[in-house]
């Protein structure tokens, strides 16, 4: 949801494929997404109950999560075609039975010309051990034009491999753009021909909830603005110059910096970015 909200606030036309109930949490989700300019698929608001995540903050603003989840999205609920890009990530892409529908939608829409992005955004408390989800994650990486992960995601999934080794492996699986975020240390991005490393944007940290999602929405928004998503995304992303890639990542880092300066997952609106 956070990526969709971030895109909506950046004035992108975005539809969220989700499921939640007619309860106080579900009604809050519906109001929040609508206020941020996000459309919902038909049937999104008719689940038996709304899943939830409780965030507990540490002294440094980092968060740990406790989840109460039901995920039963059906592929037939997601409209066929009409999207130039599809994004997925985290629990929704690995928790069954909904995860199989997510993968089916990605394969269907990619065959129809959409580009695909993926953020593993691991949640060990739900996903279990790395070995429980690696096959699914590798399949989703192989489907994707863009993969964004945090350094913490990578170290959990591949504890014996370096960031460079994992980045190189994902590129070898057909990904055109791999981005690794590193919290206060910024982010690194790599295509088949360019590598960019940028520091985090200066900010005061209130908490880190939603930072990665805000980075993702900022990156997708600026890639869309540059016509680098859609049918020819693989070629277009691979052809980016170092300066173009640097500008894309810098914008995403600015979005994340604004989000961590606020309490909760509160991504910026376009006007906040000047």
Where are the regions a protein language model picked out?
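Conserved phosphate-binding/catalytic region of the ribokinase-like
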Residues: 107-108, 161-274
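Structural alpha-helical scaffold elements that stabilize or flank donor/cofactor-binding regions
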Residues: 78-79, 139-140, 171
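Alpha-helix C-terminal capping segments
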Residues: 2-13, 57, 222-224
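Conserved N-terminal subdomain of the carbohydrate kinase-like
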Residues: 12-92, 111-114
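Conserved beta-alpha-beta core of the PfkB/ribokinase-like small-molecule kinase fold
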Residues: 85-168, 185-187
